[in-house]
């Protein structure tokens, strides 16, 4: 396999409430997963611990770092077993997984190059600190508009809060309102993967700083 000879990207996928790791295939897209594997990369879609509560990840509604420590261990295992490109470690999450990815982007800024949050962001009680204050990452932040709600959360609001939170701290967000509610439209998945590829670790300034590339999903825009 390509992983045996190439040190490729690592993409974590954190699923939403009532979902499972297999959701990664829909969320990332089969074509994108095949591209990751062809580059010698790995998709890591963890199982959640039922002890996390109603939401599947501890950091989606709390402060315990169990899932971060699992991510650290899985990443170390991938590096040892197949080899990884340390500049191309990414996280993607939907809903509760989007909350987790948003918090993880700061709590693991030491190794995350770029992230994609679908209907995630930060709630009013979240203010994560960076484990690498000098590091800068890029985030593609997507929500489904005013109808993107899962009680008690309005995901447009949480997504915008995350964008504001990271931008003022020097990170690079791109915000997308795809207008299709609490979902991942199939048409955005290629742009999400392109975003991750175009933002390896330390890509500052972003190659998108002066504008999004041609063909990028039209719901997305730079944050002024």
Model-identified regions with their sequence ranges:
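Alpha-helical scaffolding within the catalytic cores
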Residues: 25-34, 74, 102, 120-134, ...
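Acidic beta-to-alpha connecting loop that harbors the catalytic carboxylate
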Residues: 17, 48, 145-148, 179-181
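C-terminal catalytic histidine-bearing segment of alpha/beta-hydrolase fold enzymes
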Residues: 139-142, 154-224
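Alpha/beta-hydrolase fold active-site loops
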Residues: 9, 41, 113, 137-138
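Proline/glycine-enriched tight loop/beta-turn segments at coil->beta junctions
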Residues: 2-10, 134-136
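Serine-hydrolase catalytic machinery in alpha/beta-hydrolase-like enzymes
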Residues: 6-87
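Primarily recognizes the serine-hydrolase "nucleophile elbow" in alpha/beta-hydrolase
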Residues: 19, 79-81, 86-136
């Amino acid at each position: 396999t390509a992983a045996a000879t190439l040190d490729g990207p690592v993409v974590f996928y954190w699923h939403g409430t009532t979902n499972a790791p297999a959701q990664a295939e829909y969320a990332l897209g089969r074509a994108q997963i095949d591209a990751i594997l062809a580059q010698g990369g790995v998709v890591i879609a963890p199982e959640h611990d039922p002890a996390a509560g109603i939401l599947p990840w501890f950091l989606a509604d709390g402060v315990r770092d169990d899932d971060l420590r699992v991510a650290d261990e899985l990443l170390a295992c991938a590096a040892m077993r197949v080899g990884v490109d340390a500049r191309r470690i990414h996280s993607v999450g939907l809903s509760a997984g989007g909350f987790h990815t948003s918090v993880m982007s700061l709590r693991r800024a030491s190794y995350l190059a770029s992230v994609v949050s679908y209907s995630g962001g930060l709630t009013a009680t979240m203010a994560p600190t960076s484990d690498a204050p000098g590091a800068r990452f890029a985030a593609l932040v997507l929500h489904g508009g005013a109808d993107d709600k899962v009680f008690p959360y309005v995901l447009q609001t949480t997504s915008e809060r995350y964008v504001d939170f990271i931008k003022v701290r020097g990170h690079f967000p791109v915000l997308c309102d795809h207008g299709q509610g609490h979902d991942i439209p199939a048409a955005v998945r290629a742009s999400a993967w392109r975003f991750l590829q175009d933002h390896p670790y330390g890509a500052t300034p972003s190659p998108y700083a002066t504008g999004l590339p041609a063909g990028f999903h039209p719901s997305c825009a730079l944050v002024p």
